[in-house]
Amino acid sequence: MLDFWFEFASTYSYPAALRIGGLARARGVSLRWRPFLLGPLFKAQGWDNSPFNIYPAKGRYMWRDLARVCEELGAPFVRPAVFPQNTIQASRVALVALAEGWGEDFCRAVYAAEFGEGRDVGVPETVVGVLSGLKKDAAAVIERAQTDPIKLTLRRNTEEAQARGIFGAPSFVTADGELFWGNDRLEAALNWAKR
């Protein structure tokens, strides 16, 4: 078992989300997709923004590196005008989708819209468009995503991520509690989970 801790605002979670399903299946590792919010974790570290915005050189490097990673994967990449984006609604919808068995498709589609097309997933119309593209009743799904149990689950996921020592996304946690951080550590996490 491997927990995949992801945040839609996380750039490197995009390629991880594209790769993790096939790589896990090939190794026989079961996955649990765990959406959470980075904002509260950053705030606890004294940051009021993404470190990629706080440190411009780091941000420039990240955007160039992400473009290279996407090119290597054959995945589209368009830098969004807004970064980081407000991902609360998309994260809540992801919890509904994961509970209903279509979460992986939804998550990959959100990442494709955000980093493959440069769209703002913080805008409700973008999430509606993703849901419509998946042939889902967007109004009904969004209504379910606004319920107190879903809101509480996202809050608890974020609190659990912090309690586990997660400080960024993507992060991967194995059944024995080993933490791996970053898209470039995905294979190592899967190999550890397979042991």
Where are these regions (language model features)?
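Structural alpha/beta surface segment adjacent to cysteine/selenocysteine redox centers
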Residues: 14-117
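C-terminal cap of thioredoxin/glutaredoxin-like
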Residues: 2, 7-29, 34, 109-195
